[in-house]
Amino acid sequence: MNNSKIIGSKSGEPWIGLLDGTYAIVLTLLVIELPALIIELVSLIEEGISVAAVASAIATHIMGYLFATILIYDLWALHKGFKSMCVASRFSSIITMVILWLGSLLPPSIYLVQHYSQKYSISEILDKEELSTLNFEIILIRCFEIGLFVVIYFLLLALFKNEIKVSSRGDNKFRKELSDTSKIISYRFLASLTLLIVSLFIPTGFLAELPLAFLALFTLMPSDFYGKKIIST
């Protein structure tokens, strides 16, 4: 691949395939990670852990990965939408590369939160000192996980703001669409930033992915609920 040609391209088309491929791989990694975690849990039954505790942990993992999939699909849709309708520039190409790199870090961070939270939840095999250390580690990893979404939404917002600023198109409908989308992304950014701060105080264990769940549910809200109504005011 000739990077200079892609970075200097006058349209976003060369990036579409790369975007689709990267986000598809990220989602595939989530699909691979979930069965691995479930197998780990099932093996604990032989060590004397109750079936109810294992079943509860499995349900938590399934919900956690569902919310992660919702968020990654949201990023994919926003990013691809931008590249599909906007003229490419060196700035947008470089920011896109950074976003894709950050996106590739999401699966391992999600896996680590799930992996260590299941150890914390099934605490029969850990003493109090180990639990305290594990709790601190989960909080750090969770902050990194939510922090990735904060940075990615911020970079997406920067892409839209820059396009609004430099766009020479006279199509008012196009500019309004950019403006409306950028404001919706700004609410996602603020929500993720708020949850990053709140995640420092939310318990771990079965509630480890609660910030991720809140963020995913926020993205599922209709834009009219928090976007266009506020924009119109």
Question: Predicted segment positions?
Answer:
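Multi-pass alpha-helical transmembrane bundle typical of ion/small-solute transporters
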Residues: N2-T233
